[in-house]
Amino acid sequence: MLSVAIITKNEARNIEDCLRSVAWAQEIVVVDQFSTDGTADMAKRLGARVYQEPWKGFARQKNSAVEKTTGDWILSLDADERIPGPLKQEIEETIVRKDAFHGYFIARKNFFSGQWIRHGGWYPDYCLRLFNKGSGRFEERAVHEKVLLAGPVGYLRNPLEHYTYRSVADYLLRMERYSRLAALEIPEAKRLSLRQALTLRPAFTFLNMYLLRAGFLDGKKGLFLAVSYAYYTFLKYYRFSEKDLASAHPERSEKEEAS
């Protein structure tokens, strides 16, 4: 049995398309952070079992959704993601097949402002999203939460679709907020001088995305993403150097990012 686990906060613009893309699943669980735009009601109408809980952080919120499922297999999705037909078929075939894998990485087709970004490290962007409930759990960390799996992992062939930022303004706003959380997890800064981190890492980020990973092939959007990721890297280390973390209120910043 497959259970889909989703967390939401004011996702009325996304939740219907997301849930319709997984309507074939035996169970859909949504943990909602008291949305004010009708997200919870929409999810209920579309057949999801909805729970409303206060914000606990990305990983804890996702683990809460997983814990409320009853299926043997979990498909963890974000509200701005969709499961196309070919991936649906592959998932259905995979979970009834008796193989050695306890979980599967799924590639993501990331769309930015309506364009599929094929380069710059944005594709295939593998994420472990399908896993056996008894073997996986989200690692509790401030940002970039991922599934920790006790067992071997495989890869699915077909990608899911991820409709990321709606506009340049939306992207910049989220990057500004997200940098506060990312500054919490910079082990490299303990081994690298902050001056080097502030200068070399942003430059490397740009060169890596735009040249080494061929971001230039995505045109103006590829250039924008490389420049903005370099700025995000600078901002992350700058906030760390300014010891801005205490005043950043990371839990509140996470809540804003989830909205």
Indicate residue ranges for each PLM-predicted region.
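Cell-envelope/extracellular polymer assembly enzymes that use nucleotide-activated donors
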Residues: M1-S3
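Short, well-formed alpha-helical segments that are part of the catalytic scaffolds
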Residues: I6-W24
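Acidic helix N-cap motif at the loop->helix transition within catalytic regions
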Residues: E16, D37-L46, P86-L87
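A conserved acidic beta->alpha catalytic loop
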Residues: S21, D32-K44, D78
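Short, structured coil segments at secondary-structure junctions
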Residues: W24, L46-G47, Y126, L149
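Conserved donor nucleotide-binding strand/loop of the catalytic core
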Residues: A40-K68
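Catalytic-site signature of metal-activated, phosphate-bearing donor transferases
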Residues: N63-V66, D72-W73, L77, P84-A246
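Intrinsic disorder/low-complexity segments
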Residues: S247-S259
